[in-house]
Protein backbone atom coordinates (compact mmCIF):
# COMPACT_ATOMS: atom_id res chain seq x y z
CA UNK A 1 0.00 0.00 0.00
CA UNK A 2 1.20 3.50 -0.89
CA UNK A 3 0.78 6.42 1.51
CA UNK A 4 0.77 10.06 0.44
CA UNK A 5 0.73 12.97 2.90
CA UNK A 6 -0.73 16.34 1.89
CA UNK A 7 -0.38 19.39 4.08
CA UNK A 8 -1.62 22.93 3.59
CA UNK A 9 0.84 25.53 4.87
CA UNK A 10 0.39 26.97 8.36
CA UNK A 11 -1.57 30.17 8.86
CA UNK A 12 0.03 33.02 6.88
CA UNK A 13 0.14 36.70 7.76
CA UNK A 14 -2.52 37.40 5.15
CA UNK A 15 -4.68 34.51 6.33
CA UNK A 16 -4.57 36.29 9.68
CA UNK A 17 -5.53 39.60 8.04
CA UNK A 18 -8.24 37.93 5.91
CA UNK A 19 -6.68 39.03 2.62
CA UNK A 20 -6.59 37.34 -0.78
CA UNK A 21 -3.06 35.99 -1.14
CA UNK A 22 -2.65 33.96 -4.32
CA UNK A 23 0.91 34.21 -5.64
CA UNK A 24 1.91 37.01 -3.25
CA UNK A 25 4.85 35.68 -1.26
CA UNK A 26 3.82 36.31 2.35
CA UNK A 27 5.30 34.51 5.33
CA UNK A 28 3.77 32.46 8.12
CA UNK A 29 2.27 34.11 11.18
CA UNK A 30 3.47 33.14 14.66
CA UNK A 31 0.45 30.87 14.87
CA UNK A 32 1.37 29.37 11.49
CA UNK A 33 4.87 28.57 12.73
CA UNK A 34 3.33 26.81 15.72
CA UNK A 35 0.94 24.88 13.46
CA UNK A 36 3.85 23.68 11.32
CA UNK A 37 5.79 22.48 14.37
CA UNK A 38 2.69 20.67 15.56
CA UNK A 39 2.23 18.97 12.17
CA UNK A 40 5.80 17.70 12.26
CA UNK A 41 5.33 16.36 15.78
CA UNK A 42 2.09 14.62 14.76
CA UNK A 43 3.75 12.89 11.81
CA UNK A 44 6.75 11.86 13.90
CA UNK A 45 4.59 10.47 16.72
CA UNK A 46 2.54 8.47 14.22
CA UNK A 47 5.67 6.86 12.80
CA UNK A 48 5.81 8.57 9.39
CA UNK A 49 8.98 9.08 7.38
CA UNK A 50 9.63 10.45 3.88
CA UNK A 51 12.03 9.92 0.99
CA UNK A 52 11.13 13.02 -1.02
CA UNK A 53 9.12 16.21 -0.59
CA UNK A 54 7.36 18.56 -2.99
CA UNK A 55 6.30 22.15 -2.48
CA UNK A 56 5.58 25.42 -4.27
CA UNK A 57 7.96 28.36 -4.75
CA UNK A 58 6.12 30.42 -2.11
CA UNK A 59 7.74 30.80 1.29
CA UNK A 60 4.68 29.97 3.41
CA UNK A 61 4.58 26.45 1.94
CA UNK A 62 8.38 26.08 1.84
CA UNK A 63 8.81 27.19 5.45
CA UNK A 64 6.01 24.89 6.61
CA UNK A 65 7.78 21.98 4.93
CA UNK A 66 11.16 22.90 6.41
CA UNK A 67 9.67 23.05 9.90
CA UNK A 68 7.78 19.77 9.50
CA UNK A 69 10.90 17.95 8.29
CA UNK A 70 13.02 19.54 11.03
CA UNK A 71 10.60 18.35 13.71
CA UNK A 72 10.83 14.85 12.24
CA UNK A 73 14.66 14.89 12.05
CA UNK A 74 14.30 14.62 8.27
CA UNK A 75 15.91 17.90 7.17
CA UNK A 76 18.09 15.90 4.75
CA UNK A 77 15.11 14.76 2.64
CA UNK A 78 15.31 16.09 -0.96
CA UNK A 79 12.83 18.91 -1.62
CA UNK A 80 11.53 19.74 -5.10
CA UNK A 81 9.93 23.15 -5.65
CA UNK A 82 7.65 24.11 -8.54
CA UNK A 83 5.45 27.07 -9.41
CA UNK A 84 2.91 24.48 -10.58
CA UNK A 85 2.18 23.80 -6.90
CA UNK A 86 1.56 27.49 -6.16
CA UNK A 87 -1.74 28.69 -4.79
CA UNK A 88 -4.41 29.71 -7.27
CA UNK A 89 -3.62 33.14 -8.76
CA UNK A 90 -6.28 35.56 -7.53
CA UNK A 91 -5.51 38.28 -10.06
CA UNK A 92 -6.48 41.82 -9.10
CA UNK A 93 -7.96 40.57 -5.82
CA UNK A 94 -4.52 39.73 -4.41
CA UNK A 95 -3.81 41.81 -1.32
CA UNK A 96 -7.42 42.93 -0.85
CA UNK A 97 -9.32 42.29 2.37
CA UNK A 98 -12.04 39.70 1.73
CA UNK A 99 -14.72 41.46 3.78
CA UNK A 100 -14.04 44.84 2.17
CA UNK A 101 -14.07 43.22 -1.28
CA UNK A 102 -17.45 41.65 -0.50
CA UNK A 103 -18.83 45.06 0.50
CA UNK A 104 -17.54 46.58 -2.75
CA UNK A 105 -18.60 43.88 -5.22
CA UNK A 106 -21.29 42.05 -3.24
CA UNK A 107 -20.99 38.84 -1.25
CA UNK A 108 -22.51 36.75 -4.03
CA UNK A 109 -19.98 37.91 -6.63
CA UNK A 110 -17.04 37.34 -4.30
CA UNK A 111 -18.37 33.88 -3.42
CA UNK A 112 -18.52 33.07 -7.15
CA UNK A 113 -14.93 34.24 -7.63
CA UNK A 114 -13.72 32.22 -4.65
CA UNK A 115 -15.69 29.00 -4.98
CA UNK A 116 -16.86 28.41 -8.55
CA UNK A 117 -14.48 26.21 -10.50
CA UNK A 118 -14.52 28.02 -13.85
CA UNK A 119 -14.95 31.75 -13.12
CA UNK A 120 -11.78 33.85 -12.92
CA UNK A 121 -11.47 36.96 -10.72
CA UNK A 122 -10.54 40.26 -12.44
CA UNK A 123 -7.08 39.94 -13.97
CA UNK A 124 -3.94 41.85 -13.10
CA UNK A 125 -2.49 44.13 -15.73
CA UNK A 126 1.16 43.80 -16.71
CA UNK A 127 1.95 47.29 -15.36
CA UNK A 128 0.55 46.40 -11.94
CA UNK A 129 3.27 46.30 -9.23
CA UNK A 130 1.83 42.93 -8.14
CA UNK A 131 2.76 41.41 -11.53
CA UNK A 132 5.57 38.93 -10.74
CA UNK A 133 6.70 37.95 -14.26
CA UNK A 134 10.24 39.26 -13.73
CA UNK A 135 10.75 37.36 -10.49
CA UNK A 136 13.65 34.91 -11.12
CA UNK A 137 11.69 32.01 -9.63
CA UNK A 138 9.45 32.17 -12.72
CA UNK A 139 12.22 32.39 -15.32
CA UNK A 140 11.09 29.16 -17.01
CA UNK A 141 7.71 30.73 -17.82
CA UNK A 142 7.21 32.54 -21.11
CA UNK A 143 5.25 35.76 -21.11
CA UNK A 144 2.06 34.21 -22.46
CA UNK A 145 2.24 31.39 -19.90
CA UNK A 146 2.38 33.59 -16.82
CA UNK A 147 -1.11 33.85 -15.28
CA UNK A 148 -2.78 37.19 -14.66
CA UNK A 149 -5.66 35.42 -12.91
CA UNK A 150 -6.89 31.84 -12.52
CA UNK A 151 -10.02 29.85 -11.86
CA UNK A 152 -9.84 26.50 -10.08
CA UNK A 153 -9.85 24.67 -13.43
CA UNK A 154 -6.69 26.56 -14.44
CA UNK A 155 -5.05 25.68 -11.14
CA UNK A 156 -6.06 22.05 -11.42
CA UNK A 157 -4.58 21.79 -14.92
CA UNK A 158 -1.07 22.84 -13.87
CA UNK A 159 -1.21 20.90 -10.59
CA UNK A 160 -2.19 17.67 -12.36
CA UNK A 161 0.47 18.23 -15.01
CA UNK A 162 3.05 18.21 -12.21
CA UNK A 163 1.35 15.29 -10.47
CA UNK A 164 1.58 13.08 -13.55
CA UNK A 165 5.09 14.13 -14.57
CA UNK A 166 6.83 14.23 -11.18
CA UNK A 167 4.87 13.10 -8.13
CA UNK A 168 3.06 10.01 -9.43
CA UNK A 169 6.29 8.42 -10.72
CA UNK A 170 7.90 8.96 -7.29
CA UNK A 171 4.99 7.24 -5.57
CA UNK A 172 4.96 4.35 -8.03
CA UNK A 173 8.70 3.81 -7.52
CA UNK A 174 8.03 3.22 -3.82
CA UNK A 175 9.13 6.57 -2.44
CA UNK A 176 7.34 7.98 0.60
CA UNK A 177 6.06 11.42 -0.43
CA UNK A 178 4.90 14.55 1.38
CA UNK A 179 3.45 17.58 -0.44
CA UNK A 180 3.37 20.96 1.34
CA UNK A 181 1.22 23.32 -0.65
CA UNK A 182 -1.86 25.57 -0.61
CA UNK A 183 -5.59 25.36 -0.10
CA UNK A 184 -6.67 25.41 -3.74
CA UNK A 185 -3.73 23.30 -4.87
CA UNK A 186 -4.68 20.57 -2.42
CA UNK A 187 -8.36 20.95 -3.31
CA UNK A 188 -7.34 20.26 -6.92
CA UNK A 189 -5.48 17.10 -5.93
CA UNK A 190 -8.31 15.89 -3.69
CA UNK A 191 -10.81 16.53 -6.48
CA UNK A 192 -8.72 14.39 -8.82
CA UNK A 193 -7.94 11.59 -6.37
CA UNK A 194 -11.51 11.27 -5.07
CA UNK A 195 -13.12 12.01 -8.44
CA UNK A 196 -15.22 14.75 -6.87
CA UNK A 197 -17.92 16.57 -8.79
CA UNK A 198 -17.78 20.33 -9.28
CA UNK A 199 -20.35 20.72 -6.49
CA UNK A 200 -18.29 18.48 -4.23
CA UNK A 201 -15.11 20.51 -4.57
CA UNK A 202 -16.92 23.85 -4.11
CA UNK A 203 -17.77 22.93 -0.50
CA UNK A 204 -14.38 21.35 0.25
CA UNK A 205 -12.32 23.09 2.93
CA UNK A 206 -8.70 22.23 3.68
CA UNK A 207 -7.53 23.21 7.20
CA UNK A 208 -4.10 24.76 7.72
CA UNK A 209 -1.24 22.47 8.66
CA UNK A 210 -3.21 19.31 9.46
CA UNK A 211 -1.64 16.23 7.80
CA UNK A 212 -4.05 14.62 5.32
CA UNK A 213 -3.11 11.01 4.53
CA UNK A 214 -4.16 9.14 1.39
CA UNK A 215 -3.75 5.38 1.23
CA UNK A 216 -3.43 4.41 -2.44
CA UNK A 217 -3.31 1.16 -4.38
CA UNK A 218 -0.58 0.35 -6.91
CA UNK A 219 -2.43 2.36 -9.59
CA UNK A 220 -2.63 5.36 -7.21
CA UNK A 221 -6.36 4.96 -6.74
CA UNK A 222 -7.45 5.96 -3.23
CA UNK A 223 -8.37 3.23 -0.77
CA UNK A 224 -9.20 5.70 1.99
CA UNK A 225 -8.04 9.00 3.47
CA UNK A 226 -7.98 10.64 6.88
CA UNK A 227 -6.52 13.51 8.89
CA UNK A 228 -3.93 12.84 11.58
CA UNK A 229 -3.70 14.10 15.16
CA UNK A 230 -1.45 13.26 18.09
CA UNK A 231 -3.88 10.45 18.89
CA UNK A 232 -3.77 8.95 15.38
CA UNK A 233 -6.49 8.93 12.74
CA UNK A 234 -9.28 11.48 13.06
CA UNK A 235 -12.84 10.21 12.42
CA UNK A 236 -14.19 11.09 8.98
CA UNK A 237 -15.96 14.44 8.89
CA UNK A 238 -13.95 15.84 11.81
CA UNK A 239 -10.90 18.08 11.92
CA UNK A 240 -8.41 17.80 14.79
CA UNK A 241 -8.03 20.97 16.83
CA UNK A 242 -4.65 22.71 16.92
CA UNK A 243 -2.83 22.74 20.22
CA UNK A 244 -0.35 25.32 21.49
CA UNK A 245 3.04 24.01 20.34
Curated annotation (Swiss-Prot):
Taxonomic superkingdom: Bacteria
GO function term, MF aspect, one: phosphoglycerate mutase activity
GO annotation terms (biological process): gluconeogenesis; glycolytic process
Entry-linked InterPro entries: His_Pase_superF_clade-1 (IPR013078), His_PPase_superfam (IPR029033), PG/BPGM_mutase_AS (IPR001345), Phosphogly_mut1 (IPR005952)
Residue numbers annotated as active site: 9, 87
Disulfide bonds: none
Binding site for substrate: 8-15, 21-22, 60, 87-90, 98, 114-115, 183-184
Annotated SUPFAM superfamilies: Phosphoglycerate mutase-like
Keywords: Gluconeogenesis, Glycolysis, Isomerase
Keyword Transmembrane: no
Residues under site feature: Transition state stabilizer: 182
PROSITE patterns, sorted: PG_MUTASE (PS00175)
Database matches in HAMAP family: PGAM_GpmA
Biological function: Catalyzes the interconversion of 2-phosphoglycerate and 3-phosphoglycerate.
Annotated family: Belongs to the phosphoglycerate mutase family. BPG-dependent PGAM subfamily.
Name assigned to this protein: 2,3-bisphosphoglycerate-dependent phosphoglycerate mutase
UniProt source species: Bacillus thuringiensis (strain Al Hakam)
Amino acid sequence: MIKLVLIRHGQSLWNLENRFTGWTDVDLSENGLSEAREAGAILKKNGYTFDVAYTSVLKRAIRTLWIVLHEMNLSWVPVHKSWKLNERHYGALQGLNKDETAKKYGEEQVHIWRRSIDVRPPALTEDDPRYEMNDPRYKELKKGEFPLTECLVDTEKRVLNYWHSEIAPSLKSGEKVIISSHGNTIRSLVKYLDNLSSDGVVSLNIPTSIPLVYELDDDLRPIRHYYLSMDGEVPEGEFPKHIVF
